[in-house]
Regions:
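Beta-strand scaffold of nucleotide-dependent catalytic cores
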Residues: 121, 156, 220
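Short, charged/polar, Gly/Pro-enriched secondary-structure boundary elements
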Residues: 127-131, 270
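Zinc-dependent deaminase
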Residues: 128, 140-142
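Internal active-site segments that recognize and position negatively charged phosphoryl groups
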Residues: 142-172
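Glycine-rich beta-alpha junction loops
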Residues: 125-127, 160-164, 265
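Membrane helix-loop-helix hairpins that form the core translocation module of multi-pass transporters
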Residues: 100, 118-126
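A glycine-rich beta-to-alpha transition motif near the start of alpha/beta enzyme domains, typified by
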Residues: 1-115, 165-280
Length: 280
């Protein structure tokens, strides 16, 4: 048994356990994630965020989902990560370069009365290239009709840090759990996150997400961004959009430099594990 100091955080309800591991003490992070994220026998979370040293940026973020699978990027997670490393004095500036599995991302903190009240992340530039998403298709998947099981969907698929598939329809047309079938479809060799999206007007959309490796979540930052990108490419929305999600709202703006996402990051509590065994 060993003690592990951590913080429990959330970004619009998408919740994480974050801890420092500068000495690379925890080799089997998949097992650690499964133990910590278990809502009955652990702490409970959608995933873990591990703070490590970086040779290419100020700090490195490793993301592992509740099921033990690695994620290259997580929009809500990186906002929480940026707040944590600033609050803990691990970085000094309000502009932070963070190494992720999807390259170096830039975070900008909004400070009010010495507190972080919001974080903006440059999420990068999406790609629709089928081989990179990846999705089995000769052409880009943009508003394309497909059959999965007995159901037909009109989908758009892209890579924005991680694979995303967007279905634009009235938000209550499909239960979010239907995302499990789409995630596991053989047209997505690495699986996909699934976003059900409804356009409210040119400046506002509503999104609910089935997250690969985590299931239904209250918020998905990359999914919100991907949904705005899909709607914008189909000329359904403007370049700056409010995204309503079950856990709150985010603001996403498409710029020449990348997709900018702004949203909250909240530290719920800090603690220390006492009787959890991470040796497996």
């Amino acid at each position: 048994m060993e003690k592990l100091k951590f913080a429990k955080m959330h970004g619009a309800g998408n919740n994480f356990i974050i801890f420092e591991d500068f000495e690379n003490k925890y080799e089997n992070l998949e097992a650690v994630a499964k133990i910590l994220c278990d809502r009955a026998f652990g702490i409970g979370a959608d995933g873990i965020l591990v703070v490590r040293k970086s040779t290419v940026a100020e700090i490195q973020m490793i993301i592992i989902n509740a099921d033990g699978s690695y994620a290259a990027m997580c929009g809500n997670g990186i906002r929480c990560f940026a707040k944590y490393v600033y609050d803990e004095g691990l970085v000094k500036n309000t502009s932070i370069d963070i190494e992720t599995g999807d390259g170096v991302k830039h975070a900008k903190l909004e400070i009010e009365n010495n507190k972080v009240i919001g974080v903006t992340i440059n999420m990068g530039i999406p790609t629709f290239e089928p081989a990179r998403v990846p999705v089995v298709s000769e052409d880009i998947v943009l508003n394309k009709n497909i059959s999965i099981g007995e159901n037909r969907y009109t989908i758009t698929s892209m890579l924005l840090g991680v694979p995303h598939t967007i279905i634009i329809d009235p938000i209550d047309k499909y239960p979010v759990e239907e995302g499990r079938l789409i995630e596991k479809s053989n047209i997505f060799p690495q699986g996909t996150n699934v976003n059900f999206c409804e356009v409210i007007n040119k400046d506002e959309i509503t999104v609910k997400t089935w997250e690969r490796g985590a299931g239904a979540t209250l918020a998905c930052g990359t999914g919100s961004c991907a949904s705005v990108v899909a709607c914008h490419k189909l000329k359904l929305v403007n370049s700056k959009v409010k995204v309503n999600i079950p856990g709150g709202s985010l603001v996403v703006e498409i710029t020449e430099d990348g997709v900018m996402m702004t949203g909250p990051a909240v530290t719920v509590f800090e603690g220390e594990t006492l009787e959890l065994d991470f040796s497996s």
